[in-house]
Amino acid sequence: MTTYNLRLKAKSELTPHPTAQYWRKCQVEELFEMPFMELIFKAAQVHREHFDPQAIQLSTLLSIKTGGCPEECEYCPQSARYDTGLEKQVMMDVEEIVEKAKIAKARGASRFCMGAAWRGPKPKDIKVVSEIIGVVKALGLETCGTFGLLEDGMAEDLKQAGLDYYNHNLDTDPERYNKIVHTRNHDDRMDTLGKVRHAGLKVCCGGIVGMNETRPERAGLIASLANLDPQPESVPINQLIKVEGTPLENAEDLDWTEFVRTIAVARITMPKSYVRLSAGRTSMPEAMQTLCFMAGANSIFYGEKLLTTCNPEEDSDRLLMDKLDLYPLAYEPSDA
């Protein structure tokens, strides 16, 4: 098997990367330690240098194959190893997926993300999802897939089918990765990310906060994302949704200011990436989400469900956007 390692910028590099610097973990920690208002202000300045601060990219996420995943990730209700009451389902029919995509576009989404609860797809799965990708792409939607670990040639097949983005999160600080995920390691993630880049696909890569990590460990997650070379085009920042039956169901609540800080630090360290305010928004008051947008979040998951968990309804999101004078970003082939 060929191993593709997504290059991490080396500490020995004295000249910054043309588009991104190397971020030492201690430097990222210093950002987290800034006075809250100063941090938000700095992040807002960086955001305005690269984006229209009123524009929000809307993505709809659909689970096309739910439950029964053989992986053991302590945050995930889809693992077959946990009793969460979620039943394993077969893959959705192509026609049903396409209908969901049409609805998403009609409601204003510009990107359609499809997820499957696999450790990794089999060749026959790639054939099926490639057909789906082609049809969804023809609707005028940007396409994203999250299908797990990829074997050689699969990323190229997905690219050929018309996939724009591949989502593969780093989840948490590399130093604590195997405290959270027990059936794969950080290098496995990096290998698939390397294959995705090698195939010419754009990368969607983020993580989850609120899993009992410390602030330095949150800094480690952001540093690991910011030091991917090149940086991810999309960075979803998820707040843990605590699901009964998972090992993290009783995780300590993350203070809301710490989540906003994480958004701000992601914006500063990855100035040209779309920073997505991702899972956990149902528990976020409008004022908190507003601060996240001020701090540089410029993408949300849009639709009533995120894989298996609830998400704000479209009407409430549009109402909030109207209050804040935000507008949905239209899809153009040149967009990130």
From Swiss-Prot:
Query: Does Iron-sulfur count among this protein's keywords?
Result: yes
Q: What does this protein do?
A: Catalyzes the conversion of dethiobiotin (DTB) to biotin by the insertion of a sulfur atom into dethiobiotin via a radical-based mechanism.
By sequence similarity, the record places it as follows:
Belongs to the radical SAM superfamily. Biotin synthase family.
Query: Is this entry keyworded Cell cycle?
Result: no
The EC number of this protein is 2.8.1.6
Please give the HAMAP family that the UniProt record associates with this protein: BioB (MF_01694)
Residues given in the record as [4Fe-4S] cluster binding sites: C69, C73, C76
Query: What binding partners and quaternary form does the record give?
Result: Homodimer.
GO biological process terms, semicolon-separated: biotin biosynthetic process
Q: Which cofactor does it need?
A: [4Fe-4S] cluster; [2Fe-2S] cluster
Where does this protein come from, organism-wise? Actinobacillus pleuropneumoniae serotype 3 (strain JL03)
Pathway listed for it is: Cofactor biosynthesis; biotin biosynthesis; biotin from 7,8-diaminononanoate: step 2/2
Matching entries from CDD domains are given as: Radical_SAM (cd01335)
Q: Extract the PROSITE patterns matched here.
A: RADICAL_SAM
Q: What class of enzyme is it?
A: transferase
Q: What is the lineage of its organism?
A: Bacteria, Pseudomonadati, Pseudomonadota, Gammaproteobacteria, Pasteurellales
List the protein's name.
Biotin synthase
